[in-house]
Regions:
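Active-site cores that bind ATP or allylic diphosphates and position pyrophosphate for catalysis
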Residues: 1-396
Length: 396
């Protein structure tokens, strides 16, 4: 099986031993507390679940700046996006060597982790802007990632953490949320060697379904891991529970048995396009996948990125040997009325735009909200029904 990124063995930061975890929770009650923002809490979940292996905590300012500018930590580890804990007001933890990190997304703000504080560093507006420009490729405050990142605070708290809770994900998504270690173990138990990861923050339609089939066939893969984002998205996106239902229904009806694992991870979408695509590759390698499907406008939003920027970054910015995972580059997939099947649009000749069934996300949402099923060439009827029920309930 493919090795984790940056180490021989996966090292999740979640404290699995019950007794040790209880002791740390008791200790945390008397430590100075820091209520995390949602972005830092998402980072803690990913660190705890082993997805951000081999990191041992939040980056310091030198590492964060170097990762943003050069895609490497100061010690030379390849990493695409700063993993940071930015704070607006650090006065409550000033001078503390050890602190409790509290969960902003769960009632009562329970302890998520215990942190050994290395430093609390002031971050200038110029440094925040430099990082935002490098990560997102823009400083437009309308960009959802930029809007979030630039408001997180100007104090960077760095240090190693021991994770004591994976937030609400295990309770809310018991059948879907999985740690990198759990997925890696499941892949090993199935005896899969060549494994394709499919990233999604949306319900899967015919084009996505066929893309997974194509990747499996062309790579002669043993299976696909559909890995859905369960954390925070932007306003108007479909909730994780509805997406989960749609994907499970599609897999149940339209994939051969025992060829697909449906799983999810707890992270907030960055909408960082190319940089986020590389981060996706890092943590799919950590969970044991040999390939990642990267499609058109992967992890993008609006018109901020070129359609294939998330593919070209792997050739242009990722040094040879930095990652073991391979990328399966995909063009836009759509149903061809000429060929009566889903195709990659760049692979068929004698087609004009009118020969494909193409619907924008806005158009699909409008149809579903009006109780109109998209054509079966675009969405499986069983999936469309789940979505129509959701939209009509929302508008009731």
């Amino acid at each position: 099986m493919i090795k984790p990124h940056g180490s021989a063995l996966l090292n999740p930061l979640f404290v699995a031993d019950d007794q040790e975890r209880q002791q740390l929770l008791l200790e945390a009650e008397i430590l100075p507390s820091l209520l995390l923002n949602s972005a830092a809490a998402a980072n803690a979940v990913m660190l705890g679940a082993g997805y951000f292996n081999p990191l041992t905590g939040y980056m310091n300012l030198a590492d964060a700046l170097n990762v943003a500018a050069n895609l490497h930590t100061t010690e030379g580890l390849f990493w695409p996006v700063p993993i940071v804990n930015l704070v607006v007001d650090p006065s409550g933890i000033k001078g503390a060597n050890r602190i409790a990190l509290r969960d902003p997304n769960t009632d009562g703000h329970p302890v998520m982790a215990v942190m050994d504080v290395d430093a609390i560093e002031a971050v200038s507006d110029e440094q925040i802007e430099m990082m935002a420009q490098e990560i997102f490729g823009t400083l437009d405050p309308e960009h959802p990632g930029v809007g979030t990142f630039t408001q997180l605070g100007r104090n960077l708290v760095s240090g190693n953490i021991r994770v004591l809770s994976l937030s609400y994900f295990q309770a809310d998504f018991p059948d879907t949320f999985r740690t990198a270690a759990e997925i890696r173990n499941d892949i090993a138990q199935r005896g899969w060697q060549k494994v394709v990861a499919f990233q999604t923050r949306n319900p899967m339609h015919r084009a996505h379904e066929e893309l997974c089939h194509m990747a499996m066939k062309r790579l002669e893969a043993d299976g696909v891991v559909v890995h859905m984002l369960l954390g925070k998205l932007k306003q108007g996106d479909i909730p994780a529970s509805v997406r989960d239902d749609c994907i499970r229904k599609m897999v149940e009806l339209y994939f051969p048995e025992n060829t697909v694992m449906v799983t999810g991870y707890g992270f907030d979408m960055l909408y960082a396009g190319p940089r986020e695509a590389v981060l996706h590759a890092v943590f799919r390698q950590n969970m044991g996948c040999s390939h990642l499907i990267v499609g058109r406008d992967h992890a993008g939003v609006g018109d901020y990125y070129g359609a294939f920027d998330a593919q070209t970054i792997f050739a242009e910015k990722v040094p040879a040997g930095a990652l073991d995972i391979a990328i399966f580059n995909a063009d836009h997939t759509a149903f061809s009325t000429k060929l009566n099947r889903v195709v990659m649009m760049n692979e068929v000749e004698d087609h004009s735009k009118e020969d494909f069934i193409l619907l924008s996300g806005t158009k699909v949402r409008q149809m579903l909200g009006d109780g109109i099923a998209p054509p079966p060439e675009f969405a499986r009827p069983e999936v469309a029904k789940i979505l129509m029920d959701y939209y009509q309930q929302e508008s009731a």
